[in-house]
């Protein structure tokens, strides 16, 4: 049996529902690995076919909603974001994908992913809030995530958290300085004014400086010196826009 066959993915989803933490972790790890694989290989087709089956993603999202362990929730939110990015939104790079791209289940998957992001954006655990914010930013390019990011950076500044925040900030800068029409993952137009406010950009700049001061090792490893410069660019762009 191929490693990422339908049967193997079914088994992983079953393991993810186990009351045994080691078995549950094993199942989630397998699903995450599947979502992170390089696309365009022989594994791509069975993986995306499995994830795009209504019964499978419905069960997956139900499991995520009932999960209480912050570490496992982070894994779930990360794998969902990665699947959306690699398998759905970049499907046009994979040959013989016309039928897959046309599947309404892909949009339904992303709608349910947004619902999860909104649900866990107010979770008590900072790492879960970060994962939810990253997911929502990827799918919707919504400014609502920044207040959450600013708040959690006061308390959680490990390398993984900061590196994901850095990715969001750099992406925001790229979008602000792109002449193309900005769209979210649903092809809805997003105005530059709705990406981030000047107030939030300035607060992020302070939070980044605070991270470099309080946890320099993790912050520097996450590239926060360049992230700080990126925020300077965002603030400059927003200031010029406000002066027009």
Please give the residue ranges for each predicted region:
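Residue-level signature of the C-terminal ends
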Residues: 34-38, 83-90, 138-142, 168-179, ...
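Eukaryotic acidic, Ser/Thr-rich intrinsically disordered low-complexity regions
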Residues: 204, 208-244
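Residue-level detector of extended alpha-helical repeat arrays and alpha-solenoid scaffolds
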Residues: 24, 73, 129, 161-162, ...
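Amphipathic alpha-helical scaffolding segments comprising HEAT/armadillo-like alpha-solenoid repeats
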Residues: 3-13, 40-62, 89-95, 107-118, ...
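Non-membrane alpha-helical segments in proteins
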Residues: 25-37, 71-82, 131-134
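Alpha-solenoid helical repeat scaffolds
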Residues: 74, 104-109
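Short inter-helical turns and helix N-cap capping residues of alpha-solenoid HEAT/ARM repeat scaffolds
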Residues: 19-20, 68-69, 124-125, 157-158, ...
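Conserved hydrophobic register position within alpha-solenoid helical repeats
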Residues: 27, 76, 132, 164-165, ...
């Amino acid at each position: 049996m191929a490693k990422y066959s339908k049967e193997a993915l079914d088994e992983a989803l079953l393991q993810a529902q186990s009351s045994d933490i080691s078995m549950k972790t094993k199942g989630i790890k397998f699903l995450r690995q599947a979502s992170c694989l390089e696309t365009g290989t022989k594994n791509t087709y069975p993986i995306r076919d499995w994830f795009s089956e209504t019964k499978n993603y419905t069960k997956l999202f139900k499991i995520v909603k009932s999960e209480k362990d912050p570490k496992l929730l982070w894994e779930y939110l990360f794998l969902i974001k990665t699947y959306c990015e690699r398998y759905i939104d970049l499907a046009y790079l994979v040959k013989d994908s016309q039928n897959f791209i046309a599947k309404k289940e892909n949009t339904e998957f992303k709608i349910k992913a947004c619902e999860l992001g909104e649900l866990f954006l107010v979770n008590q655990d900072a790492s879960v809030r970060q994962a939810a914010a990253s997911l929502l930013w990827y799918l919707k390019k919504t400014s609502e995530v920044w207040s959450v990011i600013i708040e959690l950076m006061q308390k959680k500044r490990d390398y993984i958290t900061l590196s994901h925040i850095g990715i969001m900030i750099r992406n925001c800068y790229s979008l602000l300085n792109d002449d193309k029409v900005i769209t979210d993952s649903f092809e809805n137009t997003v105005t530059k004014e709705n990406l981030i406010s000047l107030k939030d950009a300035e607060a992020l700049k302070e939070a980044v400086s605070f991270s470099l001061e309080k946890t320099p090792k993790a912050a520097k490893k996450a590239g926060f010196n360049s992230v700080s410069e990126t925020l300077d660019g965002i603030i400059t762009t927003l200031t010029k826009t406000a002066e027009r």
